[in-house]
Amino acid sequence: MIVFDNDASTEGLVETISQGGNNLKAGDTGIVYQQYKAGTALANSTTETSLFTGTSIAPQLVGNMAQAAVATSVPIPSIPAGFLALGTGFSGNIYGTIASTGTPTLRVRVVLKNSAGTIVYTLADSTATSLSAITGTTELVVNFDAVCSATGVSGAIIGRIAVTYGTTATANTVIKAVATSGAVDTTQAYSLDVLATWGTASASNTLNTLIGTIGVY
């Protein structure tokens, strides 16, 4: 297991994380956020909502899983000002369930928020896409990457996302978004999140994240 700050005590890191202080630092790599229990399902709503609502840990910030369990339900690590360097990237994998009635639209996007929680940049976006008819409750898989390609006030990040969902127990459909480059001021601090939005509110339109990870490289 990769451990951040090898010269720091694990006990101190656990305490820092439990107090919400799991901020990234220059040189940090590995899995920095892991949801391991299902959260609240996004259902009967058209409100854009985070896909990370379940119980979580920051596994790479502590020495072992037993100690990591002390720091449950941590926020996704903050990205401090200046952290993003050329080639620095984020990757994420989300596995969950989805069900719908009819063919509603679904949008999933990866965003950066400022300290006030306001979305300031969209790194990757599936856009609102009409789903194929879904039979029963099937799997939902979201994969994304976002890589810094320029730094400074006029910095840039290239992002891509793919959303795979089952139309039946044995057939899948993939929503792919072409990788795009967007302007990002890397001198500012941010938080990263993955958001989903249903186009139609229905109790039958529901999705939930069972497990999910965010990594830094």
Where do the language-model regions lie?
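Short, surface-exposed terminal/edge motifs of secreted or surface/virion proteins that either
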Residues: 2-26
